[in-house]
C-alpha cells in the first residue's frame, strides 16, 4: 500500500500526521489493521502536543462497570487435581449489549483529543467498513486479518514513543558522556529526563537509583550475581538465595549458575493458584541468607505476587529483596517505597517502548546497597554498567514510562474488560476448559487457558493468523510442557493443552471478538477428531444400551 493511499484513506490533513500513523503499522503489507487500530486510537486533526506527538484518542468508556467475574460460575474438579473447570452447562449468560460500548474515555487530557472525525468500533461510516488490504493466501483468496495477542512476549512501540525517539536517531546524536560541548549536554539531559520518568512510574526518590541496561535479562543477572558476589566477598558465610519455581528463565538460570559457584538456592513451590506463601518464605530465611527474588507479575499465568508483604518480611529479616517487574512496570501500580523493594528489573519493550533497553532500580538507603559490576569499561552508570548509552533507546524507554504513568488506569480497565468478555464467551460455548492461575490477584492482560482434549500446539497452528503462544517466548520453541504450569500442580497432559493470550493498549474489540469466534471453532473442530474427547463424552452419556457390546478375547 502506497504512502499517499494511506493519507487518502485516513483523510489526514498533513504528511506529519500521516507518518505518525504509517510508522506504527504492524507490517507494511497488512495495512488493513489501520482501520482497527488507528481509527480507534488517534485523531485525524492537525493538532499535536508540545513535542509533536499525535494526541491520543478516547477509545473506551471509563464509566463501564466491570464484573469481578473471578472464580464464580459452574466449577467441577478433575480427578487428577483441583482445577477450575468451566462447563457449558453452567449458568453463564453473556450480556452482549454491555460489550458493544467500546468507547472508553481517559482521565488524561495531555493525549486526549475529542475529535468528531475519528472512527470507532461501532462506526457505520466507510472508514470502518472499508478494508484497505486484506491478507490473502497464495490463491489470492481472502483470509482472516492477522492481529497480535502475544503481548507478554513483546508490545508494539507506541507512536508517541517513536515520535520522541526520532530526533535522537537523526540530528541529536551526541554522546551523553561527552561533557565538553552542547551535543553531549543535550543527550545527557535527555537521559536524565528519562530516568526521572522511570522514577515517577515506580515512585523512586533519586535519579542515581536507575541503572540502564540492555534489558530485563541483564538487569536480573546484575542484581543476583552482583549482590551475591559482593556480599559473599565481605562474609563467606553469606551464600543463600531464596526464589520460586515459577520465575522467568533468566532468574532460574542465573541461580543455577550461582549454585555452580558455591551458593545455596532455595526454590519455593507456589500453591495451585501460583502464589508463593509468606510462611514458606519466612521458614526458608536462614542466618546466611543474602537476598530473596520473586517475580512481580508472572509472564505465563499473569499472577501478581504479594510483593508488599514479601518486601516487609525481607526488611524485617534484614535481607535484600529483588523483584523482576518486567511484566509489571507500566501495567500495574508499583511503589518501591511502600513495597520495600531494594532492587527491581524493568524492560522497555514490555511497556510499549523499544527493544534493547532495560533498567535496574537500586534503592539508595543507609547503608547503600552495593554490588559488583558485570561489564567493565569506561565506568558509565556509576561504574555498574560500562558502555556508551543508547540515547535514543533510553529516551524511548522514558517516554513509554511517562505515557504508562498517565494511562495505566485506562489500560487496566480495557484489558480487564477484554479478559471478562473472553472468559464469559468461552465458558458459554465450550466445556472442559481451565483458566490457569489465580483469577483475582492477577494482571488481566494475561490469560492462560487449557482446552482439554486439544493439543495446544495444534490449536496455535489452526489459529496461525492470530499471534498467540503456548507459554514464555523464551521457551515456546520447545515442545516441553510449561514448567510454570507443572509447578502449580497441573498435570503434564493438561499443561500441553494450554495457550496464552496477551491483550495490550492497542487491542481492539473487533480482534477480541474474532479471537473468541475462531477459538471456539478451532477447539470444536479439533475435539471432533479426538478419540479421547469422544471417550469422555461416552462416559458422561452411557445411554447407548442398544449398541451390542463386544468382548475381546
UniProtKB/Swiss-Prot annotation:
The keyword Phosphoprotein does not apply. It catalyses: (sulfur carrier)-H + L-cysteine = (sulfur carrier)-SH + L-alanine. Its EC number is 2.8.1.7. Pfam families: Aminotran_5. Its cofactor is pyridoxal 5'-phosphate. InterPro entries: Aminotrans_V_dom, Aminotrans_V_PyrdxlP_BS, PyrdxlP-dep_Trfase, PyrdxlP-dep_Trfase_major, PyrdxlP-dep_Trfase_small. Keywords: Iron, Iron-sulfur, Metal-binding, Mitochondrion, Pyridoxal phosphate, Transferase. It is found in: Mitochondrion. It is an enzyme of class 2 (transferase). Gene3D superfamilies: Aspartate Aminotransferase, domain 1 (3.90.1150.10), Type I PLP-dependent aspartate aminotransferase-like (Major domain) (3.40.640.10). One of its GO terms (cellular component) is mitochondrion. Residues 102-122 have a biased composition (Low complexity). GO terms for biological process: cysteine metabolic process; iron-sulfur cluster assembly. Residues 102-125 are annotated as: Disordered. One of its GO terms (molecular function) is iron-sulfur cluster binding. Pathway: Cofactor biosynthesis; iron-sulfur cluster biosynthesis. NCBIfam families: PRK14012.1. Catalyzes sulfur activation and mobilization in iron-sulfur cluster formation (ISC) pathway for iron-sulfur (Fe-S) cluster biogenesis. Active when in complex with a partner protein Isd11. Homotetramer. Interacts with Isd11; the interaction enhances cysteine desulfurase activity of IscS. Interacts with IscU. Component of a complex, at least composed of IscS, Isd11 and IscU. Belongs to the class-V pyridoxal-phosphate-dependent aminotransferase family. NifS/IscS subfamily. This is Cysteine desulfurase IscS. It comes from Plasmodium falciparum (isolate 3D7). The lineage of its organism: Eukaryota, Sar, Alveolata, Apicomplexa, Aconoidasida. The gene is IscS.
Amino acid at each position: 500500500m502506497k504512502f499517499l493511499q494511506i493519507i487518502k484513506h485516513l483523510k489526514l490533513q498533513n504528511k506529519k500526521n500521516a507518518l505518525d500513523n504509517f510508522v506504527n503499522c504492524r507490517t507494511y503489507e497488512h495495512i488493513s489493521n489501520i482501520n482497527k487500530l488507528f481509527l480507534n486510537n488517534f485523531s485525524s486533526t492537525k493538532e499535536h502536543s508540545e513535542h509533536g506527538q499525535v494526541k491520543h484518542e478516547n477509545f473506551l468508556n471509563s464509566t463501564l462497570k466491570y464484573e469481578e467475574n473471578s472464580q464464580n460460575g459452574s466449577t467441577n474438579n478433575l480427578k487428577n487435581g483441583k482445577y477450575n473447570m468451566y462447563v457449558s452447562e453452567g449458568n453463564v449468560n453473556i450480556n452482549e449489549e454491555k460489550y458493544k460500548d467500546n468507547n472508553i474515555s481517559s482521565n488524561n487530557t495531555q493525549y486526549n483529543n475529542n475529535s468528531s472525525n475519528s472512527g470507532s468500533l461501532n462506526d457505520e461510516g466507510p472508514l470502518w467498513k472499508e478494508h484497505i488490504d486484506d491478507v490473502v493466501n497464495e490463491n489470492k483468496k481472502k483470509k482472516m486479518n492477522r492481529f497480535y495477542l502475544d503481548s507478554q512476549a513483546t508490545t508494539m512501540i507506541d507512536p508517541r514513543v517513536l515520535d520522541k525517539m526520532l530526533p535522537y536517531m537523526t540530528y541529536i546524536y551526541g554522546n551523553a558522556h561527552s561533557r565538553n560541548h552542547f551535543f553531549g549536554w543535550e543527550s545527557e539531559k535527555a537521559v536524565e529526563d528519562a530516568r526521572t520518568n522511570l522514577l515517577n512510574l515506580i515512585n523512586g526518590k533519586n535519579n542515581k537509583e536507575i541503572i540502564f541496561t540492555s534489558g530485563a535479562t541483564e538487569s536480573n543477572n546484575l542484581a543476583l550475581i552482583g549482590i551475591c558476589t559482593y556480599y559473599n566477598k565481605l562474609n563467606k558465610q553469606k551464600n543463600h538465595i531464596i526464589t520460586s519455581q515459577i520465575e522467568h528463565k533468566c532468574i532460574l538460570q542465573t541461580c543455577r549458575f550461582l549454585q555452580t559457584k558455591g551458593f545455596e538456592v532455595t526454590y519455593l513451590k507456589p500453591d495451585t493458584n501460583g502464589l508463593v506463601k509468606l510462611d514458606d518464605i519466612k521458614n526458608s530465611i536462614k542466618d546466611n541468607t543474602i537476598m530473596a527474588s520473586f517475580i512481580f507479575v508472572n509472564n505465563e499465568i499473569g499472577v501478581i505476587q504479594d510483593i508488599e508483604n514479601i518486601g516487609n518480611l525481607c526488611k524485617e529479616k534484614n535481607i535484600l529483596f529483588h523483584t523482576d517487574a518486567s511484566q509489571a512496570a507500566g501495567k500495574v501500580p508499583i511503589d518501591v517505597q511502600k513495597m520495600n523493594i531494594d532492587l527491581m528489573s524493568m524492560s522497555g519493550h514490555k511497556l510499549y517502548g523499544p527493544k534493547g533497553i532495560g533498567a535496574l532500580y537500586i534503592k539508595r538507603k543507609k547503608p547503600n546497597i552495593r554490588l559488583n559490576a558485570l561489564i567493565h569499561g569506561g565506568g558509565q552508570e556509576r561504574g555498574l554498567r560500562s558502555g556508551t548509552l543508547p540515547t535514543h533507546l533510553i529516551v524511548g524507554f522514558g517516554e513509554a514510562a511517562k505515557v504508562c504513568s498517565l494511562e495505566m488506569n485506562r489500560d487496566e480497565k480495557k484489558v480487564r474488560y477484554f479478559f471478562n468478555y473472553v472468559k464469559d464467551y468461552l465458558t458459554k460455548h465450550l466445556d472442559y476448559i481451565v483458566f490457569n492461575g489465580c483469577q483475582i490477584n492477577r494482571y488481566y492482560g494475561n490469560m492462560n487457558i487449557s482446552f482439554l482434549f486439544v493439543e495446544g500446539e495444534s490449536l496455535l497452528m489452526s489459529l496461525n493468523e492470530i499471534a498467540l503462544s503456548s507459554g514464555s517466548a523464551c521457551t515456546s520453541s520447545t515442545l516441553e510442557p510449561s514448567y510454570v504450569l507443572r509447578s502449580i500442580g497441573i498435570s503434564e497432559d493438561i499443561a500441553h493443552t494450554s495457550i496464552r493470550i496477551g491483550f495490550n493498549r492497542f487491542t481492539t474489540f473487533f480482534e477480541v471478538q474474532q479471537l473468541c469466534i475462531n477459538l471456539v471453532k478451532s477447539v470444536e473442530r479439533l475435539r471432533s477428531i479426538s478419540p479421547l474427547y469422544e471417550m469422555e463424552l461416552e462416559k458422561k452419556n452411557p445411554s447407548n444400551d442398544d449398541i451390542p457390546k463386544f468382548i475381546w478375547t
